[in-house]
């Protein structure tokens, strides 16, 4: 068995990204039949891995601000993705509420010194 190697993981940025201020007013959106069925499938979180041949400083000062700006602008058209799901007591139905004070998505950026190709390989 191969010797275990300690690898470091460091959070380099955590922020909430919302649509540009004042661009989307408070909006309630009713759920469709399909939306209601999906409520019981569980919470979805996405994780993306990228190998970047640039220094961390370049990434945090150049690339990351552009990624956040792009995500913010995409929320102009897809603001329910930055909204909250509210489930009032019966007989009321669940709905999505976008509120400028609470509408955002959490973005966490992490770097690691682990071997990228080894981490992404299928070891099954």
Go through the PLM ranges and name each one:
Residues 1-124:
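Non-catalytic N-terminal regions of enzymes
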């Amino acid at each position: 068995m191969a010797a275990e190697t300690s690898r470091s993981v460091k959070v380099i940025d955590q922020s909430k990204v919302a649509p540009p201020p004042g661009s989307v007013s408070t909006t309630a959106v009713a759920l469709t039949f399909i939306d209601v069925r999906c409520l019981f499938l569980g919470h979805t979180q996405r994780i993306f891995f990228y190998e970047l041949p640039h220094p961390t400083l370049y990434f945090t000062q150049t690339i990351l601000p552009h990624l956040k700006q792009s995500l913010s602008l995409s929320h102009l058209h897809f603001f329910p993705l930055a909204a909250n799901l509210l489930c009032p007591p019966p007989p009321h139905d669940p709905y999505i509420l976008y509120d400028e004070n609470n509408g955002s998505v959490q973005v966490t950026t992490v770097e690691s010194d682990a071997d990228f190709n080894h981490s992404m390989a299928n070891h099954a």
